[in-house]
Amino acid sequence: MKVKVSGEYTLAEIEVELDQQLTPDDLQPGATVLATNESTGGLERIVSHEELSRFFAVGPAGALPMPTDVVVERTLADPAFKQILQEADGKKGFDPQAEQMKIRDFLAGVTSSKMTTEQSVFHGSRSNSSASTVNRIKCPTCLVQFDAVAFQNHSCEAKPIEVAVPQQEKPHLVPTVSAPPAPLSKPASERVIRENQVRLRRYIKDEMKYDLATGIESSRKNAAKGPNECTMCDRKFVHASGLVRHMEKHALDLIPSQTSEQPHTIPAAGLHVVVKCNSCGRIFYDPQVAFRHGLIHDSEHSTMRQSPMTQVPSNRADFNELLLDGEMLIDNDPAFATSNQNTNPPKKEMFSSLILGSVLQCEFCEYIFADIAELLVHSASHVAERRFECTACDIQMNTAKEASIHFQTDCIFMREAIRSLNVTLSRYFVCNVCELKFANTDLLQEHRCTSFHYFPRLNENGKKLLLPCDFCDVNFEFAHDFLAHSEEKHLNKKKREKETRNTGAGRIRQYLCDICGKSYTQSSHLWQHLRFHQGVKPFVCQEENCDRKFTIRPDLNDHIRKCHTGERPYLCLVCGKRFLTGSVFYQHRLIHRGERRYECEECGKRFYRADALKNHQRIHTGEKPYSCLFCTKTFRQRGDRDKHIRARHSHLDANSRLMMQMQKFQLETAAAQKAQSHNPEQQDNDVAGGASTSDVPSGSGFMSTEPSVAEMQYSITPEQQEEMVCVPIDEVNNSFFMSHYMQAVPMEEDGSGQHIIVFEQPGQNMDMMSIYDQQQVGEPMHESGVPKRPAEENARVVVVKNNPTKPIFSDTYL
C-alpha cells in the first residue's frame, strides 16, 4: 500500500491483484473513501452503501445485509411500525410513498454495527482480521499504528496535520477522527449526524426489530419463554392464573403514548430543587432540559418579530429534533458551533428555582407543573378531538377512560393481538373508588349503591350536581333519594334473581334435623346442631372457679372474653367501636354499609337485622309476649319490659315482690273465669267431656280453656292495674289473703310433696305468727309448728323468711 500527499487531499492508494476482491472491512479505521465524479471531474466523498458497492465487492453470503426493499416492505406492513412513523411525523394521515423514502434514506446511513466515535460508519466487524490488528492504536499526529506497549513509549515529533496544511485550506481538510467533513446536500448524510459525533438510538433492535446483518428477527417476544412466563417482561409464575392477573397490568401498555416527546424520569419521593419556566409554568428536574426548553420560547419570539418574507425555509429545525431524540455526545464541529453563537441563550429571568415535594402532571401528556392554574391552562391546549387514538382500528376517543373501555371490550383487533400471546385477558369492571373488580355492570352498580360510591355529574346548565341512575334515565339531587330509588326499583329485583339462581342442586340443604326441622348443607354443621338437643357440652372453661360448659367452641371464646379477659378484638374501622363477638360486629357493619337486608311484608320497611324485623312485625300482629313479673303489663320487646321493672318495681323488697305476683295471679285468674263465662259452648263441651271447672281450682294450669295474653290484658281494667300497689302485710286481711291463695295451689291426688307458701312478717316471732285456713279458721297449731290440712295430712307449709341481702329475683330486673 502506497501513501502519498497530493495537493489538498491525503489519499490512500491500495494496490490489489486482478482476481482479488476488496471489501469495506479492508479499510483502516477513520478512512474516508473519495471517488472521481465523471461529470465534474472532481473528487467526491462516498457516504452510502449503494455508492460504495460500485468500487468494492460485497461480503460473503453469511454476512449479507437484508435487502433494503425487504426491510421497507416489512416495516410498512407492520401496524406498530406504521404507528411509530406516524407519531414521529406528527401528521394525521399516513403517506406510504413519503415514509418509504424516509426509511430508505435512513437505511442508507445505518450499518449493522453500533456507531461509535472510534469507528467509521462504513467500518464493520472484521471477522478475518487478526488479534494484533484489532488491538493496534494509531497516533493521531503521525498516523502510524502501534500496539499498546509501543504506543506508550512513542514520542511523536511530527507536526500535526492541521499545522502542515495551510490555514486557507483547513476547511477542506479530510479529517480522520475528530473533525467531520462539511455536510453534503443529501439527507442521508445529515442522518449520519456529522460523521459519528452523535450516536442515535439503535433502530436495529429497539424500533426496526430486525438485524440488518443477518435478517433474523430479534424481537424479544420470540425468545424462548416458559409456559407461565410473561411475554412482556421477565416475570415468571407458578400457576397460569397468576400470569393472567399479571398480564392485565400490561393491557394498557400495548397502546403507545400519543406524545412524541420521551417521558422524563421523575426522581423518588421527597423534596427536590426544580427549575420552573416563567413563561409556560412547566417545571424540570434537569437544568439542561430546561435550557433547551427556553430556546423554544426564544425562537417563538424571534419568529413573531420576523416578517414572513424574511423567513428562509431550512431543514435545520427538523435536524435538531432528530438530535433531541438520540443521545447527544460532545460536539466539536466549528461550523455548528459558529451557527449556535448566533442564537442568543435564554435569559436567566425566564427561569426560577423551586423546592417541591409533589408535582402536578397533565393527564394527556408528560408535562409537569407546580401550580394548578398553569396546569389547567395547559390542559385546555390539548385538542379534544384527538387525545386518544386506538392503534389497531384508528378510532379516536376523548378521555383515557373511554380508551381503556374500548381496548378491553370493543376493539376486536386488540383482542386478537392479545390472543396471539396465548394469554387470556379476563373482562371485568372496576370501581373507580375502591378498585374492586366485578364480572358485570349489574354487580358493579349494586356495589356502588350499597357502598355509597356515587359519581355526581353536572346538569345541563352546569350549576347543580346530580346523581344519575345507571339503570334508568332518572337523576337525583340527594343521596338518600337515590339510595331509596336503587333499593326499591333495582337492587331488590337483582337480589331476588340472585336468590333464585342460588337455589340450584349444589345448594340444597340435604342434612335435616329430625327434632326441630332445621336443614344444613354440611353434615358437620348438623352434628354441631344436634349437641344443643342432646345437651352435650364438651367445651369447658379452664379459668379458676369457673366450670361453665358450652356446646360449641365459639360460645366458649365469647364467654372467656366477656367474663374473664374483657377483650374486644373486633374493631370497626369506621366509627372505632369494639365488639366482643363476631356476630355483633357483623351486624354493626351492616349499619355503615347501609345494607337493610330484611324487609317487612306488610309495610315494606327494611331493617339491618332479623331480630329487628321480628320485633317490628309484632306491631302488625299486636303480639306482646313479654309480660311484667309483678303486674299485668305486657311488652313487645324484652328490653322494654326490663326498663319497666327497673323503673316501677326496683324499690320492692322480697315480700313485696311476692305479694305483687300474687295480686297479678288473682287478677289473671278472674279474667280467665270471666272469659270462660262468656263462652258457654266451650263450657258445655268441657262438661260433656267429663271435666268441670269445679274439679280443678281456678287459676291453676289444669284448666281446659286457657285465655291468651291479649284476652287477659283486655279483661283487666285500668282501674284494677292502678290498684296493684305494694301494701305492707299488716294493712291487709291476712285471713282472706292466705285462705284464698292457699286454695289456688294445685295439689296431687295423694297430696304428697305439695307445699303451701306462708309468710313471716318482718320483726314478728315465728311462734306468734297466726296461720289461717279457709275451711277451719280456728284449727290449732301442731307441735311441730307447721300446720296441716285435715284432708291432706302430708301437705306441709313452707315458711319463707325475709332476707334482704338475698333477693328472690335476679338483679337484671333491678
UniProtKB/Swiss-Prot annotation:
Sample GO molecular function, one term: DNA-binding transcription factor activity
Subcellular compartments: Nucleus
Annotated zinc fingers (C2H2-type), start-end: 228-250, 275-297, 360-382, 429-453, 467-490, 511-533, 539-564, 570-592, 598-620, 626-649
UniProt xrefs under PROSITE patterns: ZINC_FINGER_C2H2_1, ZINC_FINGER_C2H2_2
Tissues expressing this chain: Expressed in testis; primary spermatocytes.
InterPro entries documented for this protein: Znf_C2H2_sf, Znf_C2H2_type
Pfam families for this protein: zf-C2H2
One GO term (biological process): spermatogenesis
GO CC annotation, single: nucleus
Main location group: nucleus
Stretch list, region Disordered: 669-705
Disulfide bonds: none
Biased composition regions of type Polar residues, renumbered to the chain: 691-705
SUPFAM superfamilies referenced in this protein's UniProt entry, alphabetically: beta-beta-alpha zinc fingers
Gene3D superfamilies membership: Classic Zinc Finger (3.30.160.60)
SMART domains: ZnF_C2H2 (SM00355)
Keyword annotations from UniProtKB, A to Z: Developmental protein, Differentiation, DNA-binding, Meiosis, Metal-binding, Nucleus, Repeat, Spermatogenesis, Transcription, Transcription regulation, Zinc, Zinc-finger
Task of the protein: Required for male meiotic division and spermatid differentiation. Required for accumulation of aly and comr on chromatin. May function as a transcription factor.
Record text on subunit structure and interactions: Interacts with comr.
The protein, known as: Testis-specific zinc finger protein topi
Organism: Drosophila melanogaster
